[in-house]
Amino acid sequence: MSHLAVSQMAVTVPVSSDFSVRRSAFKSSNLNFRDKSWAPVFTLGMKAKNCGWRNHNVICMSVQQASVPKVTVSPLELENPSEPPLNLHKPKEPYTATIVSVERLVGPKAPGETCHIVINHDGNVPYWEGQSYGVIPPGENPKKPGSPHNVRLYSIASTRYGDNFDGKTASLCVRRAVYYDPVTGKEDPSKNGVCSNFLCDSKPGDKIKIAGPSGKIMLLPEDDPNATHIMIATGTGVAPYRGYLRRMFMESVPTFKFGGLAWLFLGVANVDSLLYDDEFTKYLKDYPDNFRYNRALSREEKNKNGGKMYVQDKIEEYSDEIFKLLDNGAHIYFCGLRGMMPGIQETLKRVAEKRGESWEEKLSQLKKNKQWHVEVY
């Protein structure tokens, strides 16, 4: 069902000395109806206005896009377990799923190809947000003749209900690993990533062997629906956060009503490399009080020292707010290339020292309180 929202309304209301409003005397004007997808919430402000024969108060009603329709999901039985599913399918006995779709996520100027891959598991490999699937590419392991390839882990980029909201699919965010010879500069297909190329080259209907799900470090804590979650990613490390944010802002789950703050920092090379940017930008518009989104574009932006803008530079820029939020119990997550962590740790240590704090002690406390979540590869 669509909703009509009043974007602006002004009504002239006669009032007595005790400000009681006579219902029969309302006169409306300046009605504008826009965007069908929002349900209106009115805020009232009263100010005196001389209308000639009698003093009136003008009640100005401003409308916020505060009730955004969400998607109905099923089966809600996926909310019942108190513990996350773990290793339901072992690498030696993987589940055979089916490729639903493969979509290129990045633009032509991105350095490399990243794909969004939807897999149909028919409800047989359930998972929670923040977990990973193991993928076993077809073929033989060249280092172990007669044996299958090793398992490659990929963070799941959807909620437990999947992109179709029916609990039967899971999505992966995969960057194609291509090797270029450092001397000739030419691609050497024999050294390309086996699993990432298999996934990005897959077609709808192709079969895929998956193991898992695995992982508990990046699970989204849901004991406090008003908690703050600071999410830091480079590249495909944004995958689990897409799942978090869809659960927070897109899906209608009766037992989970998010009212806290989600703050995403995403570092990529350039605008063409941004992943799921349209989704995140929409959340920013729809939920300005509950979502913040900062991007670091290393090949297009400069930091305060004139160097490349990395995600740690954005962290330093907002460090006062971040540290205050951490002091108040915020969770902070890091996901992406392993090489991102040294620069981030150095930045956090430098900021802590400027604040007269010991970063080692603070980090120890964050880990003790289970506020610190890291998954790098």
From Swiss-Prot:
Residues annotated to bind NADP(+): S155, R175, T236, V268, A269, S298, R299, K308, G336, L337, E375
CDD domains: CYPOR_like_FNR (cd06208)
Catalyzed reaction equations: 2 reduced [2Fe-2S]-[ferredoxin] + NADP(+) + H(+) = 2 oxidized [2Fe-2S]-[ferredoxin] + NADPH
Keywords: Chloroplast, Electron transport, FAD, Flavoprotein, NADP, Oxidoreductase, Photosynthesis, Plastid, Transit peptide, Transport
Subcellular location(s) per record: Plastid, Chloroplast
Gene3D superfamilies named in the record: Nucleotide-binding domain of ferredoxin-NADP reductase (FNR) module (3.40.50.80), Translation factors (2.40.30.10)
Domain FAD-binding FR-type: 92-220
Binding site for FAD: R152, L153, Y154, S155, C173, V174, R175, Y179, V194, C195, S196, T236
Record-listed E.C. numbers: 1.18.1.2
UniProt-recorded Gene Ontology molecular function terms: ferredoxin-NADP+ reductase activity
Pathway named in the protein's UniProt entry: Energy metabolism; photosynthesis
Gene Ontology process terms (BP): photosynthesis
Enzyme class: oxidoreductase
InterPro entries given in the database record: FAD-bd_FR_type, Flavoprot_Pyr_Nucl_cyt_Rdtase, FNR, FNR_nucleotide-bd, FNR_plant_Cyanobacteria, OxRdtase_FAD/NAD-bd, Riboflavin_synthase-like_b-brl
Pfam families: NAD_binding_1
Record-level GO cellular component terms: chloroplast
Transit peptide: 1-61
Necessary cofactors: FAD
Main location: plastid
Purpose of the protein: May play a key role in regulating the relative amounts of cyclic and non-cyclic electron flow to meet the demands of the plant for ATP and reducing power. Is involved in nitrate assimilation.
Similarity comment: Belongs to the ferredoxin--NADP reductase type 1 family.
Protein known as: Ferredoxin--NADP reductase, root isozyme, chloroplastic
